[in-house]
């Protein structure tokens, strides 16, 4: 999304990010140095960069402060972006569904922390 942020905002259009949780990478399940036993683990390798890990760390920290999940925080971060009309996320389990329907309101400071981590 952020690669195209300038194009979207300069043309006064909104984006609809299809992978709002970056194929599961932003759920907090993937952590640096931890092997995840999942058939989907291979789909997140492109996100496993210094920047990606910084975003996950920030999501986890903010989630703790809100007594929430990294998934809920990631979706709140997208909702806080005026260029995003609505994020799309999917769930495989009931537990995941509870995480993605939770509504969290982030402070501007928290949004800034996430924006800096993703820059």
Annotate the PLM regions:
Residues 20, 39, 48-105:
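Conserved short secondary-structure transition element at the edge of the structured enzyme core
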Residues 18-19, 77, 110-118:
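Tryptophan-centric aromatic hotspots in well-structured domains and transmembrane helices
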Residues 30-31, 102, 119:
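A generic structural signal for secondary-structure junctions
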Residues 1-2:
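Short, small-residue-biased leader/transition segments that mark boundaries at the very start
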Residues 6-60:
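Glycine-rich, positively charged active-site loop/lid region within alpha/beta enzyme cores that binds
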